[in-house]
């Protein structure tokens, strides 16, 4: 277990991945098209990031935008994409499948988790669309996933902080709960103090429209989060 909470940053380009690493991120979630919540990155992007970035990289496995109810063809595509990500040296994968009842698709998620081994699986924020978070927690644990990325069912982690704290406690020693959605230097202290989470996820994608000045701003924002996480709780501000 890491001494300090781990910071995962979601990115969609090589430049952003490199800036996140320079800024102090501990891990990267690699996607494309973050405007729709992220989809599976291209083979070329995975290869480029793997060759240039030295911290762990987890690849999103999501064949399209929209809901998380996947056809059999889409499911097979996810399995193929997962195998490609594994072959390209990704350190983990991020995915989530629901049934038409909005509950976790345990069977097919477990199949993908088995295909991913020994890579860890993060079940993404499809979790927040389930009707009962505690039931969904047990379902995800049953799939063999290593962690859940969640806002606690709210629009943001700050708004879902109470549910997040309950999930962290309920999942302790069985699965990692990683708060995500709207996490910033302004609210990370309260989220960590309330939830006692050991990992946090932030996108910061709104500050990266330019490959020059705004990427320096992106790196600075990541650095602020990383600096806060490396301080003892009493010294965070």
Q: What are the language-model segments listed below?
A:
Residues 14-16, 39, 46-106:
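Active-site beta->alpha loop and helix N-cap motifs at the rims of alpha/beta catalytic domains
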Residues 27-39, 84-100, 145-158, 195-219:
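Glycine-rich phosphate-binding active-site loops on the catalytic face of alpha/beta enzymes
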Residues 13-15, 32-34, 63-65, 99-101, ...:
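Active-site-proximal loop/turn and secondary-structure-junction residues that shape catalytic pockets
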Residues 86-143:
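Hydrophobic, well-structured mid-protein blocks that either form specific transmembrane helices
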Residues 12-22, 69-84, 121, 128-143, ...:
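Catalytic cores of alpha/beta
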Residues 1-10, 14, 50-51, 233-236:
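N-terminal amphipathic alpha-helix/helix-capping segment at the start of soluble metabolic enzymes
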Residues 38-65, 104-126, 159-185, 217-236:
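Alpha-helix-loop-beta-strand connector modules within alpha/beta enzyme cores
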Residues 5-11, 28-30, 49, 57-61, ...:
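Hydrophobic faces of well-ordered beta-strands that scaffold small-molecule active sites
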